[in-house]
Amino acid sequence: MAKKSKKKINASPSAADAYVTSTGMCVRSTGSQYDVLLDDSAGEVIPCKVKGNFRLKGIRTTNPVAVGDRVTLLRNADGSAYITAVAPRRNYIIRRASNLSKEASILAANLDGCMLVATLKHPVTATTFIDRFLATAEAYSVPATLVINKTDLLDNDRELLEAVRYLYESIGYTVVPVSAHTGEGLDRLRELLQGRTTLLSGNSGVGKSTLINDLIPGLDLRTAAISDVHDQGTHTTTFSEMFPLPFGGWIIDTPGVRGFGTIEMTPQEVSHYFPEIFRASDECRFGDCSHTHEPGCAVLKALEENRIAQSRYNSYLSILNEIDEGKYRAPQ
């Protein structure tokens, strides 16, 4: 089959109109405009655009440029600036807007780590959401930390907190209970963030903006109350933005999301992104075991013996069924 000819990217006016080429890092993305911190200046940030036909080879997303990207841009005599190239990414976090959507967006790129902020009360973060985020981080080689916020609301339910903490720490994840209200865990959070570029993600209403305000005094990001009717937050962050931390490093704030659709996974790969399932699968009788019904499946045996949590296995099945709708069922 003949290959389609590739159109030449025309990401800016003609080179003759441009008076300088610069490089920098994208620190803010609103979807239609990007702010770039220039390498060759004392903290100068300039607004840039990309042309509508700008695309990265091999990746089709709603945002061709993501916060954290290293970019090349042309600045023109009229003051406008256009991004002309994006350097190869070390890694990134990508998601589908919803389970029904085929469009994907990159939350951030070139990360040293990511933190999922979850809450066990007001609102409750679903374990499926947690597991989908962690699986995506595994898939794209981004070390993940689980931050459990609003621990001050769990004074009468610390057993739940300890159970969730034990579950994810036993798998191998770092879990940090924090409270922006009491200050619990904030010093540990600073230790993990120092000198690193870290994405912060989570459902709306889990307190991401409040935590960032505590970590960066004077920033004053907008926060919002939780709906008493639906126990959900409202979106106060509407675009991704990168902030320098006063103790060194960068933190990337992203809009709160209600769902986390995975992308670019095959059914055979999904188990690789659940560390405890992947470890158990070494003992399966068949190399192509789906861990759903096959005889001699070591994963199903581990599930039966409570060495794999039912909630984690359910999350594994949910991703399988998202890829191949309705094919996989929990064992009876």
For each feature predicted by the language model, list its residue ranges.
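Short boundary/loop segments of OB/S1/cold-shock single-stranded nucleic-acid-binding domains
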Residues: 1-22, 74
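Helix-rich effector regions associated with P-loop NTPase G domains
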Residues: 17-20, 32, 47, 57-77, ...
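Conserved hydrophobic positions within beta-strands
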Residues: 24-26, 83
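A short macromolecule-binding patch
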Residues: 43-53
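Short, Lys/Arg- and Gly-enriched loop/turn segments at beta-strand edges
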Residues: 78-86, 124-126
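Conserved beta-strand/loop subsegment of P-loop NTPase cores
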Residues: 110-118, 141-151, 171-178
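Canonical P-loop GTPase G-domain recognition
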Residues: 153-206
